[in-house]
Amino acid sequence: MQLDKQNLIWIDLEMTGLDPESERIIEIATIVTDKHLNILAEGPVLAIHQSDECLAKMNDWCMKTHTENGLVERVKNSRLTERAAELQTLDFLKKWVPKGVSPICGNSVSQDKRFLFKYMPELADYFHYRHLDVSTLKELASRWKPDVLKGFTKKNTHLALDDIRESIAELAYYREHFINLKNE
Protein backbone atom coordinates (compact mmCIF):
# COMPACT_ATOMS: atom_id res chain seq x y z
CA MET A 1 0.00 0.00 0.00
CA GLN A 2 1.35 3.38 -0.97
CA LEU A 3 -0.15 6.80 -0.30
CA ASP A 4 0.15 8.59 -3.64
CA LYS A 5 -1.26 11.93 -4.83
CA GLN A 6 -1.66 10.49 -8.34
CA ASN A 7 -3.94 7.64 -7.23
CA LEU A 8 -7.57 7.89 -8.24
CA ILE A 9 -10.61 7.16 -6.08
CA TRP A 10 -13.44 5.42 -7.90
CA ILE A 11 -16.82 5.29 -6.20
CA ASP A 12 -20.30 4.08 -6.90
CA LEU A 13 -23.47 4.33 -4.89
CA GLU A 14 -26.71 2.49 -5.32
CA MET A 15 -29.69 4.45 -4.10
CA THR A 16 -33.42 3.99 -3.65
CA GLY A 17 -33.94 6.66 -6.33
CA LEU A 18 -32.41 9.76 -7.84
CA ASP A 19 -33.51 12.54 -5.47
CA PRO A 20 -31.26 12.94 -2.42
CA GLU A 21 -33.99 14.93 -0.66
CA SER A 22 -36.31 11.91 -0.54
CA GLU A 23 -34.18 8.86 -1.41
CA ARG A 24 -31.35 7.10 0.44
CA ILE A 25 -28.05 5.33 -0.21
CA ILE A 26 -28.31 1.53 -0.04
CA GLU A 27 -24.83 0.48 -1.20
CA ILE A 28 -21.37 2.01 -1.48
CA ALA A 29 -18.14 0.66 -2.93
CA THR A 30 -14.76 2.16 -3.76
CA ILE A 31 -11.69 1.18 -5.74
CA VAL A 32 -8.32 2.94 -5.85
CA THR A 33 -6.33 2.86 -9.09
CA ASP A 34 -3.02 4.34 -10.07
CA LYS A 35 -2.97 7.05 -12.74
CA HIS A 36 -2.81 4.37 -15.45
CA LEU A 37 -6.07 2.79 -14.22
CA ASN A 38 -4.40 -0.27 -12.70
CA ILE A 39 -6.44 -1.40 -9.70
CA LEU A 40 -4.41 -1.05 -6.50
CA ALA A 41 -7.09 -1.95 -3.96
CA GLU A 42 -10.79 -2.57 -3.57
CA GLY A 43 -12.44 -0.90 -0.62
CA PRO A 44 -15.27 -2.27 1.45
CA VAL A 45 -18.49 -3.10 -0.39
CA LEU A 46 -21.20 -2.08 2.03
CA ALA A 47 -24.95 -2.59 1.99
CA ILE A 48 -26.53 0.11 4.14
CA HIS A 49 -29.61 -0.67 6.17
CA GLN A 50 -32.74 1.27 5.30
CA SER A 51 -36.21 0.70 6.70
CA ASP A 52 -38.84 -1.40 4.94
CA GLU A 53 -40.83 1.82 4.60
CA CYS A 54 -37.94 3.49 2.76
CA LEU A 55 -37.45 0.49 0.47
CA ALA A 56 -41.18 0.28 -0.29
CA LYS A 57 -41.03 3.82 -1.73
CA MET A 58 -38.66 2.76 -4.52
CA ASN A 59 -40.04 3.09 -8.02
CA ASP A 60 -40.74 -0.06 -10.05
CA TRP A 61 -37.37 0.01 -11.84
CA CYS A 62 -35.38 0.30 -8.60
CA MET A 63 -37.45 -2.34 -6.83
CA LYS A 64 -37.12 -4.83 -9.70
CA THR A 65 -33.41 -4.19 -10.28
CA HIS A 66 -32.32 -4.18 -6.65
CA THR A 67 -34.47 -7.21 -5.81
CA GLU A 68 -33.17 -9.26 -8.75
CA ASN A 69 -29.51 -8.45 -8.00
CA GLY A 70 -29.96 -9.33 -4.31
CA LEU A 71 -29.31 -5.84 -2.97
CA VAL A 72 -32.73 -5.40 -1.32
CA GLU A 73 -32.16 -8.54 0.74
CA ARG A 74 -28.63 -7.42 1.68
CA VAL A 75 -29.97 -4.01 2.76
CA LYS A 76 -32.69 -5.61 4.88
CA ASN A 77 -30.13 -7.88 6.57
CA SER A 78 -27.56 -5.12 7.09
CA ARG A 79 -27.27 -3.22 10.35
CA LEU A 80 -24.82 -0.71 8.91
CA THR A 81 -25.76 2.98 9.03
CA GLU A 82 -24.75 5.55 6.43
CA ARG A 83 -22.34 7.06 8.96
CA ALA A 84 -20.69 3.71 9.70
CA ALA A 85 -20.32 3.03 5.97
CA GLU A 86 -18.85 6.51 5.51
CA LEU A 87 -16.27 5.92 8.25
CA GLN A 88 -15.25 2.49 6.91
CA THR A 89 -14.84 3.96 3.43
CA LEU A 90 -12.76 6.87 4.74
CA ASP A 91 -10.53 4.50 6.75
CA PHE A 92 -9.81 2.61 3.53
CA LEU A 93 -9.18 5.70 1.38
CA LYS A 94 -6.81 7.33 3.88
CA LYS A 95 -4.36 4.45 3.29
CA TRP A 96 -4.14 5.17 -0.44
CA VAL A 97 -4.88 8.80 -1.29
CA PRO A 98 -4.36 12.03 0.68
CA LYS A 99 -7.44 14.15 1.31
CA GLY A 100 -8.38 16.68 -1.34
CA VAL A 101 -6.25 15.44 -4.23
CA SER A 102 -8.26 12.81 -6.12
CA PRO A 103 -11.24 13.81 -8.18
CA ILE A 104 -14.31 11.68 -7.64
CA CYS A 105 -14.15 9.07 -10.43
CA GLY A 106 -16.87 6.97 -11.99
CA ASN A 107 -19.93 7.21 -14.21
CA SER A 108 -22.41 10.06 -13.64
CA VAL A 109 -20.52 10.91 -10.46
CA SER A 110 -22.27 14.23 -9.96
CA GLN A 111 -25.33 12.20 -8.97
CA ASP A 112 -23.30 10.20 -6.44
CA LYS A 113 -21.78 13.39 -5.09
CA ARG A 114 -25.25 14.90 -4.47
CA PHE A 115 -26.03 11.93 -2.19
CA LEU A 116 -22.61 12.12 -0.54
CA PHE A 117 -23.11 15.81 0.30
CA LYS A 118 -26.47 14.97 1.90
CA TYR A 119 -25.69 11.71 3.73
CA MET A 120 -21.90 11.35 3.88
CA PRO A 121 -20.52 14.91 3.99
CA GLU A 122 -17.13 13.96 5.43
CA LEU A 123 -16.57 11.55 2.54
CA ALA A 124 -17.81 14.14 0.03
CA ASP A 125 -15.23 16.55 1.44
CA TYR A 126 -12.42 14.01 1.00
CA PHE A 127 -12.43 14.45 -2.80
CA HIS A 128 -10.92 17.24 -4.88
CA TYR A 129 -13.60 19.51 -6.31
CA ARG A 130 -13.00 18.14 -9.83
CA HIS A 131 -14.75 15.11 -11.30
CA LEU A 132 -13.44 12.39 -13.59
CA ASP A 133 -16.71 11.32 -15.17
CA VAL A 134 -16.53 8.51 -17.72
CA SER A 135 -20.02 9.38 -18.93
CA THR A 136 -18.59 12.62 -20.36
CA LEU A 137 -16.43 10.62 -22.76
CA LYS A 138 -19.40 8.41 -23.63
CA GLU A 139 -21.46 11.50 -24.48
CA LEU A 140 -18.65 12.98 -26.58
CA ALA A 141 -18.03 9.69 -28.39
CA SER A 142 -21.75 9.36 -29.19
CA ARG A 143 -21.57 12.72 -30.95
CA TRP A 144 -18.09 12.75 -32.48
CA LYS A 145 -17.26 9.09 -33.09
CA PRO A 146 -20.37 6.94 -32.53
CA ASP A 147 -18.79 3.75 -33.88
CA VAL A 148 -16.54 3.71 -30.80
CA LEU A 149 -19.56 2.99 -28.61
CA LYS A 150 -20.13 -0.38 -30.30
CA GLY A 151 -16.86 -1.73 -28.93
CA PHE A 152 -17.75 -1.55 -25.24
CA THR A 153 -20.73 -3.22 -23.62
CA LYS A 154 -21.61 -2.99 -19.95
CA LYS A 155 -23.35 -5.74 -17.97
CA ASN A 156 -25.29 -3.20 -15.88
CA THR A 157 -25.67 -5.34 -12.76
CA HIS A 158 -26.32 -2.18 -10.73
CA LEU A 159 -24.13 -3.46 -7.93
CA ALA A 160 -21.64 -0.82 -6.82
CA LEU A 161 -18.39 -2.79 -7.14
CA ASP A 162 -19.33 -4.24 -10.54
CA ASP A 163 -20.27 -0.77 -11.76
CA ILE A 164 -16.91 0.66 -10.69
CA ARG A 165 -14.98 -2.12 -12.42
CA GLU A 166 -16.97 -1.45 -15.58
CA SER A 167 -16.33 2.30 -15.33
CA ILE A 168 -12.57 1.73 -15.07
CA ALA A 169 -12.65 -0.68 -18.02
CA GLU A 170 -14.80 1.76 -19.99
CA LEU A 171 -12.36 4.62 -19.41
CA ALA A 172 -9.45 2.38 -20.44
CA TYR A 173 -11.40 1.51 -23.60
CA TYR A 174 -12.05 5.17 -24.43
CA ARG A 175 -8.43 6.04 -23.69
CA GLU A 176 -7.33 3.62 -26.39
CA HIS A 177 -10.14 3.83 -28.95
CA PHE A 178 -11.42 7.39 -28.63
CA ILE A 179 -8.55 9.45 -27.25
CA ASN A 180 -6.06 7.11 -28.97
CA LEU A 181 -3.59 6.78 -26.13
CA LYS A 182 -1.94 3.52 -25.16
CA ASN A 183 -1.36 2.65 -21.50
CA GLU A 184 2.21 3.54 -20.55
Curated annotation (Swiss-Prot):
Its EC number is 3.1.15.-. Its main location: cytoplasm. GO terms for biological process: DNA metabolic process. GO terms for cellular component: cytoplasm. Pfam families: RNase_T. CDD domains: Orn (cd06135). The active site is at Y129. Keywords: Cytoplasm, Exonuclease, Hydrolase, Nuclease. GO terms for molecular function: 3'-5'-RNA exonuclease activity; nucleic acid binding. Residues 8-171 form the Exonuclease domain. Belongs to the oligoribonuclease family. 3'-to-5' exoribonuclease specific for small oligoribonucleotides. This is Oligoribonuclease. It comes from Pasteurella multocida (strain Pm70).
